[in-house]
Amino acid sequence: GAWIQCVNGQFQGMPTEKMKKVLVSQLDNLQKAGINAIIFQVRAEADALYKSPYEPWSRFLTGVQGKAPSSMWDPLQFMIEECHKRNMELHAWINPYRAKTKGTGALSPMHPYSKNPELFVQYAGQLYFDPGLPESRKYICKIVRDIVTRYDVDAIHMDDYFYPYPNPGEEFPDNVSFAAYGRGFTRRADWRRDNVNVLIKEIHETVRECKPWVKFGVSPFGIYRNKKNDPNGSETNGLQNYDDLYADVLLWVNNGWVDYNIPQIYWEIGHSSSAVYRSGCDTHCIESGFDESEPEPDSGKV
């Protein structure tokens, strides 16, 4: 599989016909390389690279959030058609919690923050749905349901953006939601993990209810846990999904809540920990791939 993202701005303000030519050229090259699945980013910050009844057109498409493309074309529909012509799958890639990146100025009146600011928190200069709020999960599942119902996608895809990457010296501001919806948890870390677990389970159920043949997959950060913290972990000493992003990926795989898991292994080929990590994920990682363009800015992916 190959990822085609939008947040580096390579499509921003690009004329429709030129963008179509760029995408077709990428698909042709990827097909020649043997790629059979395209993971196309359609929701980067509670916006849309498709015609959404709930969220604004993305600034990463037109340059201004909420501004429709002049020809009223639909990039997601275009990519579905072009991928299927080539016997490729199209996986619609959404970022669930992130609602505003650092480079975004004014939000569209159609943006969910403009309508329901109580669902959001500010952290590290960005805006996020509060994962601790049941209404946040309900809203995200509504977006998933809309995409799966109206588009002939082969999968819904989420990458490594669960709780945000830690910002040194800043605590994620969820005191209010923890007090209101703590569900008896005494350790906040366990509660945060459960918030993400519930969302993953509910997205899985949403997809199955709409179209049972559509897959739901994730491409989380490449370290589940370091072995010094967990015997199931890898011989690594880096940031951990379980402890830092509150993503218990192993639980999702074991419970069948995701159809595929593609860890993002950003270290170089031949890294001393690579073989050890691979032996730990053979039964869980069913696809591999690469990013057609550069990693997202401020992503922590190095």
Feature-to-residue mapping (PLM):
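The substrate-binding groove and active-site-proximal loops of carbohydrate-active enzymes
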Residues: 7-17, 57-73, 123-141, 183-196, ...
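Glycoside hydrolase catalytic-domain groove-lining segments
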Residues: 171, 177-232, 236-302
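Active-site-adjacent "subsite" loops/lids of carbohydrate-active enzymes
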Residues: 3-21, 76, 81, 91-92, ...
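Aromatic-lined substrate-binding rim segments of carbohydrate-active enzymes
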Residues: 24-27, 40-95, 182-210, 278
